[in-house]
Swiss-Prot record:
<keyword id="KW-0963">Cytoplasm</keyword>
<dbReference type="InterPro" id="IPR028989">
    <property type="entry name" value="RimP_N"/>
</dbReference>
<comment type="function">
    <text>Required for maturation of 30S ribosomal subunits.</text>
</comment>
<dbReference type="Pfam" id="PF02576">
    <property type="entry name" value="RimP_N"/>
</dbReference>
<dbReference type="InterPro" id="IPR028998">
    <property type="entry name" value="RimP_C"/>
</dbReference>
<dbReference type="Pfam" id="PF17384">
    <property type="entry name" value="DUF150_C"/>
</dbReference>
<comment type="similarity">
    <text>Belongs to the RimP family.</text>
</comment>
<dbReference type="GO" id="GO:0000028">
    <property type="term" value="P:ribosomal small subunit assembly"/>
</dbReference>
<dbReference type="GO" id="GO:0005829">
    <property type="term" value="C:cytosol"/>
</dbReference>
<dbReference type="InterPro" id="IPR036847">
    <property type="entry name" value="RimP_C_sf"/>
</dbReference>
<protein>
    <recommendedName>
        <fullName>Ribosome maturation factor RimP</fullName>
    </recommendedName>
</protein>
<keyword id="KW-0690">Ribosome biogenesis</keyword>
<dbReference type="InterPro" id="IPR035956">
    <property type="entry name" value="RimP_N_sf"/>
</dbReference>
<dbReference type="GO" id="GO:0006412">
    <property type="term" value="P:translation"/>
</dbReference>
<dbReference type="InterPro" id="IPR003728">
    <property type="entry name" value="Ribosome_maturation_RimP"/>
</dbReference>
């Protein structure tokens, strides 16, 4: 049901975002404790502010009331993806070149399934990271289809 809900919400929110010059980053439909949450993460090249989030929430809420894809009560949250935004699409990886990222893979690459480092290149098929390994820097090439999840990483020194 979760996948069906997120697909329906994506179809409903995309025209709203296109009209406002915004982009969809991610949709989450999750149960936390007794409550269900529908979270829609939006962004633009200039970032998003609370007024834009509120406007999207209002318009999307109207559409959700019309279509009613969720049979029970839930909380709708519309926000920016934050500093550690997920990288979901190829264009997200391309935009993140030069930034620090955290990647989990479906299977081990060079004996590891988790990587954190600078995204140095992305050609559509391979994600290239510069990572620290025992005090030295090394390059790791990760096949794009083996990426289970990825996000920007905030590094604290």
């Amino acid at each position: 049901m979760s996948k069906k809900v997120t697909e329906t919400v994506e179809q409903l929110v995309t025209p709203i975002l296109d009209e406002m010059g915004l982009e969809l980053v991610d949709i989450e439909y999750v149960k936390e404790g007794k409550n269900w949450f529908l979270r829609v993460f939006i962004d633009s090249d200039d970032g998003v502010d609370i007024e834009q989030c509120g406007a999207v929430s209002e318009k999307l809420s109207e559409k959700l009331d019309e279509v009613d894809p969720i049979p029970h009560n839930y909380f709708l949250e519309v926000s920016s993806p934050g500093a550690e935004r997920p990288l979901k699409k190829a264009k997200d990886f391309a935009k993140a070149i030069g930034k620090n990222v955290y990647i989990k893979t479906y299977e081990p690459i060079e004996g590891e399934k988790q990587f954190e480092g600078e995204l140095t290149a992305f050609d559509g098929t391979t994600v290239t990271l510069l990572v620290k390994d025992r005090g030295r820097q090394k390059t790791v090439a990760i096949p794009y289809e083996k990426v289970a999840s990825a996000r920007l990483a905030v590094i604290f020194f």
